[in-house]
Design a protein with these regions (language model features):
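Alpha-helical transmembrane segments of multi-pass membrane proteins predominantly involved
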Residues: 1-487
Length: 487
């Protein structure tokens, strides 16, 4: 049986590349059935512990996965794969922890909630290592389909349902554009392969008669990716989805999908399509500049913290796209990864504080932070550190991650974009510092309630994120070298 023997050899060779994903998929499947059948209904919260264990076990196996390609070039493990897989899994753990802070608002957290989180994380782990346009597409869909449901998880709230439907419809539209772009590139490459490395060589040698086909294909793939990271002008879904989703899912969307999509951006445009960079460099520069400008300007007018963080995340995507444009140079991928790590730390701390305040009927509006420095000085200090780091104030970790990204862009000749990034960072500092001023220079609202204890989860998430942001100030000059050991 030569076929069976060959299949067994291929599985033995290639399956170890997917051990982290296999752990998550098997765990989620067992949780849905037979686990959900035999676990009493009142014990559903134990699935949170199972989910965290699965995510940590998956993270433990990431470092042990062999470097190389598998499945006929559909998937590969390298520094980018491992580095961004760690970020995705960390975001998953943080989301499960934050979900425990909103049990009452979310209602009963059924096993499906955690299974969808695991399936979505598995899709992201596939995405960061996908080296073929077809595997990239299916990974994106596995990631997105689960998030559509999680956004609309609060079935009794019209706002959550509306956000989920909008996200799903626009997501389906963008997936169609992405798939059409892939088909055009497949045709322009001779109809032979969709592997990134091989397709890049074929597109670079394509005859002039195929130049329009190549340009349209690359442009459509770029549009599909820009939607996934909520870059301007494909950001329309982001504020409503962030505002309507359960806050832990909002935090998840701001961290994990962005990390996975940025890894795909690096692989497709930073290295995969560098042979036809003239076709996508100018459109990507426009998207990056528009994201930085519109994201920061729109954030100035927001009245709720979730929408402020939504528009802020659009601006941060613009900064990271600036790094993608320079990713072909030494240190490019490391600078983007470091920025994404810093962003994950800051977002996790900010959303933990928002969720904690929502537990007492506050935190929804920015005005709810009024006088927090007097009523909860430690929480206000942590929020101040996070806001200052998001603004890029030295010597916090956010400053160093922006510095390396902007320095790299300058060295690659993107002077105009770097100037735009610096100017829009000054705009961002205004609305971040406005939150700090509200906490320390405004009187708190009158309240007769005794201060509610922070709890173990809030203390750990906020404390750890704040401590790491502060600790980064001590190692600023060595951060990029450290990132190079991981990515």
């Amino acid at each position: 049986m030569p076929f069976a023997a060959g299949l067994w050899d291929a599985l033995q060779r290639d399956l170890p590349l997917l051990f982290p994903q296999i752990i998550l998929i098997v765990t989620a499947t067992v949780m849905l059935w037979p686990g959900d059948v035999f676990v009493p209904r009142g014990d559903k919260r134990r699935w949170a512990y199972v989910t965290v264990i699965a995510l940590l076990l998956s993270a433990f196996t990431v470092s042990g996965t062999p470097v190389g390609q598998g499945f006929n070039g559909m998937f590969q493990v390298d520094g980018i794969t491992r580095g961004f897989q760690y970020l995705v899994l960390a975001a998953g753990v943080i989301t499960v922890l934050l979900s425990q802070l909103q049990l009452d608002a979310l209602g009963e957290q059924t096993v499906e909630y955690y299974a969808l989180l695991l399936f979505s994380c598995a899709g992201m782990l596939f995405l960061v290592g996908a080296s073929d346009l077809v595997s990239i597409y299916f990974s994106l869909e596995l990631m997105a389909l689960c998030i559509y449901i999680l956004v609309a998880y609060l079935r009794t709230q019209a706002r959550s349902i509306e956000a989920g439907v909008k996200y799903f419809l626009l997501g389906a539209f963008s997936s169609g554009i992405l798939l059409f772009g892939i088909s055009l590139l497949f045709a322009a490459g001779g109809g032979v392969t969709t592997n990134l490395a091989e397709l890049n060589q074929r597109l670079a040698l394509a005859p002039p008669s195929s130049s329009l086909l190549v340009f349209l294909g690359v442009l459509m793939v770029l549009v599909g990716f820009c939607f996934k990271v909520a870059a301007v002008p494909f950001h329309m879904w982001s504020p409503d989805a962030y505002d309507g989703a359960p806050t832990p899912i909002t935090a998840f969307m701001s961290m994990a999908p962005k990390a996975a999509s940025m890894a795909a951006f690096l692989r497709v445009f930073g290295t995969g399509f560098n042979g036809v960079s003239s076709d996508w460099m100018a459109p990507l520069a426009f998207v990056a500049a528009a994201s930085m400008i519109l994201g920061n300007v729109a954030a100035l007018r927001q009245q709720t913290m979730k929408r402020l963080l939504a528009y802020s995340s659009i601006a941060h995507v613009g900064y990271m796209l600036l790094g993608v444009m320079a990713a072909g140079s030494p240190g490019g991928a490391q600078a983007v990864w470091l920025y994404m790590l810093t962003y994950l730390l800051m977002q996790s701390g900010a959303f933990a504080i928002v969720i904690f305040l929502q537990g007492k009927g506050e935190g929804e509006r920015i005005d709810d932070f009024r006088g927090l420095g007097r009523t909860r000085p430690l929480l206000a200090f942590a929020m101040m550190v996070i806001m200052l780091s998001l603004a890029g104030v030295p010597p916090l970790l956010g400053f160093f991650s922006k510095f390396y990204l902007f320095k790299l862009a300058m060295e690659q000749g993107h002077v105009t974009l770097t100037v735009i990034a610096l100017l829009t960072s000054a705009v961002a500092a205004y609305y971040y510092l406005a939150v700090v001023a509200l906490m320390y220079f405004k009187e708190p609202a009158a309240s007769t309630e005794a201060p509610r204890p922070m709890g173990l989860v809030t203390t750990w998430v906020v404390g750890l994120s704040c401590a790491l942001v502060l600790l980064g100030t001590c190692f600023g000059a060595k951060l990029l070298d450290w990132a190079a050991t991981i990515v």
